[in-house]
């Protein structure tokens, strides 16, 4: 098997593992469940496509610094390999679109999670914020938040937030043409406005 084929399989397996973990923990908070359900609905209906690909795009809900943080977090979740990662497929735009359609209290919970990420970075690493932390420190924090059985009550908000953004990142990635065609092997039939679902494991 060629190296690129190994890479494709490994990437799909990694994203499946991320998805299964997100689904398993999605009931950790009601706002997480609400937001991830909305994200799946948006991804499967492709309602966000036109807004995401617009050349003059700007965030409708997130501030510019919040959007920058979402870009960084999602790229750490699905990084670029031989195919573009979350940043290259505009997952941040998908997330902003979903947040715009979400209930105000759900949006507020997500934004509170972003604020918590920056505050926790300052507390743990003496960094200005998450983006000011080193790559190693950033990965350390996200690893802590994704660890099963993490008993740290101070990180409960962060764990709920990370499960939400992880699930939304996966759905947003598969909303993109690259995610569908390169990762799922779509021949062009799935990337349609009427796409209603997906039979891959990560969307079960």
What are these regions (language model features)?
Residues 2-4, 53-54, 67-76, 90-204:
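Mature-region segments of soluble proteins
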